[in-house]
Amino acid sequence: MIFGLSLIPIIFLTGMALDFTSAAQKRTRLNAAADAAALAAVTPAMMLQSNSAALAAATNMFSATAANIGAATVNPPTITMTNAGLVRTVTVAYTATSTNMFPNVFSFVTGAQHTTWPMSGSATATSYSAPNINFYLMLDNSPSMDIAATSAGITTMVNNTSAQGGCALACHETNPTAADVQGNPGGEDNYTLAQNLGVVTRIELMAQATSALMTTAADTEAANDATYRMAIYTFNGTGISTIYAPSGAPSSNLSAAGTAASGINVLEVYSNNYLTKTNENNDTDTNFETAMTGVNTLMPAPGNGSASSTPQEVLFIVSDGVDDEVNSSSCSEPLDGTRCQQPFNTSMCTTVKGRGIMIAVLYTEYLPLPTNSWYNTWISPFQSTLATNMQNCASPGLYFEITTDGDITAAMQTLFQLAIATARLTQ
């Protein structure tokens, strides 16, 4: 008798436990279906589609997954979608009932059968559309960027300019003095000497890399369903010079931008200490602050990138990081008369970043030239600080550097992809 009575709560608890466990298992599967549905609406491919297409994808995914759950009644999901700028957020909510295997168990307590167990849940997923971006490329074409690009090239140039003390720089002078080109066959400048020797210079590789980058940008914008516009400038001692900026602004004609970039060349000077025949500038051929001030005036306030009319803005700088300007009042290094040779003054970088414009920096290492007396006197004392200084100019995560024998094309493309990824994550 006692044993028989004890079976009643045991049967009750066992039946309830089995029904609860069954419902919990089904709810786990429905939660997974909701997760899959929410994610289906924000895949990279679906982010390129309309809201209605994304809603349909989420609905179909949930229905297909939930259809495999037996002994349950699943109501159509409630799917909400919001788009705020580049951000899409999708929430999939569901209600369902699990059919109980022991509906009479509850009648011992409530006096009525309970044929189902209620279930509900939701899942949320968020993703980002690729932003539309205007890129402003500011490329250093001062004489120091015309150094031989490889270790072998540097050795070749030094060995063939021994009468000058060994010079790895292929300076481009239209009217060189005898001292400038001492020992060169025919009296040609070092630029022509490098060409005759088959020495590839860093600026040549930069031009090729910039041109190749336009092809990468075109392929990437097509894949992302975004618009990337380009403006290309060089800078030296006189500020910035336009290489490509139709109508004074970035252009979406990336093919034309690539063609223009392939023509980038080193600053041509008259002779040592002379920019032109009548402009004795003491070789002050790199003024970063003036260049930054100039490009800053060209860049409008950035948008959020959600439309081509409201693009984000990215300033892309390639340089070896050495200023060479007339500056007798605020030079951080010893002066040569009024000539200031120092690491870039990055105060304008702070100004630009403060406007919400991202800065990507490729530092092409200013290579030690121990056989060159000018380098040893004026550049060597601060050469080791250049990389840190250039990194301080860049936005977080948008700094890259290469040295001798480095692949400038790969470096620029890596930095470009980092800039795109960072632009998306900031929204």
Summary of predicted features, one role per range:
Residues A149-G153, V158-C171, G321-N389:
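VWA/integrin I-like adhesion module and closely mimicked acidic/polar interface patches used
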Residues A38-V42, N132-F316, D323, Y363-E365, T403-A411:
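Von Willebrand factor
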Residues L137-S142, M206, I232-F235, V295, ...:
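DG-centered beta-turn motif at the end of beta-strands
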Residues A58, F62-A72, L362-Q427:
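Von Willebrand factor A/integrin I-like adhesion domains
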Residues M1-L55, G153, A360, A394:
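Alpha-helical assembly-interface signal, strongest on the long, hydrophobic N-terminal helix that forms
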Residues A226-L275, S329, P370-M390:
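Short beta-strand-loop
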Residues A38-S98, A212-I240, G294, G397, ...:
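Short amphipathic secondary-structure patches
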